[in-house]
């Protein structure tokens, strides 16, 4: 083994519970790395815009890294198709997404399109 990384994440205050839901099968996972003390600045604006954003595609979960690589914020959204994702993204500016905040811009962004495992309660 050349490298290994372990992380523990806690749900953001507005993150929904992990319950059985059929909101996929495509999921977009985004992870942002911020400077220290910036993540708390985005949480309020995110929570305020969440209902409008959920109308475009449901939030699977939002998480803050607690152990390992810290100062990271991850959010996962469900899409019925890749076309659904494209259509939702085209409407983001009309709802003010992403929300404006006093946080400094992220230092790094990672984006992945994934599909649920067979055993996942969220499909």
What are these regions (language model features)?
Residues 1-31:
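Surface-exposed beta-loop interaction hotspot
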Residues 1-9, 45-60, 69, 78-117:
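An amphipathic, aromatic/His-enriched active-site/gating alpha helix that lines ligand/cofactor pockets
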Residues 16-23, 115-123:
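Short, low-order "capping/linker" segments at domain edges
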Residues 33, 76-78:
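Short hydrophobic/aromatic beta-strand micro-patches
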Residues 33-43:
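Short, surface-exposed ligand-recognition loops at beta-strand->loop->(often short) alpha-helix junctions
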Residues 66:
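Conserved beta-strand-loop-alpha-helix junction that forms the acyl-donor binding cleft
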């Amino acid at each position: 083994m050349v490298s290994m990384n372990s992380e523990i994440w806690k749900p953001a205050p507005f993150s929904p519970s992990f319950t059985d839901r059929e909101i996929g099968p495509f999921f977009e996972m985004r992870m942002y790395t911020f400077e220290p003390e910036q993540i708390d600045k985005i949480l309020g604006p995110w929570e305020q815009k969440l209902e409008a954003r959920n109308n475009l595609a449901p939030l699977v979960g939002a998480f803050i890294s607690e152990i390992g690589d810290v100062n990271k914020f991850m959010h996962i959204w469900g899409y019925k198709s890749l076309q659904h994702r494209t259509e939702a993204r085209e409407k983001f500016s009309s709802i003010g997404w992403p929300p404006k905040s006093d946080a400094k811009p992220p230092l790094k962004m990672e984006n992945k399109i994934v599909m649920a495992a067979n055993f996942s309660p969220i499909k």
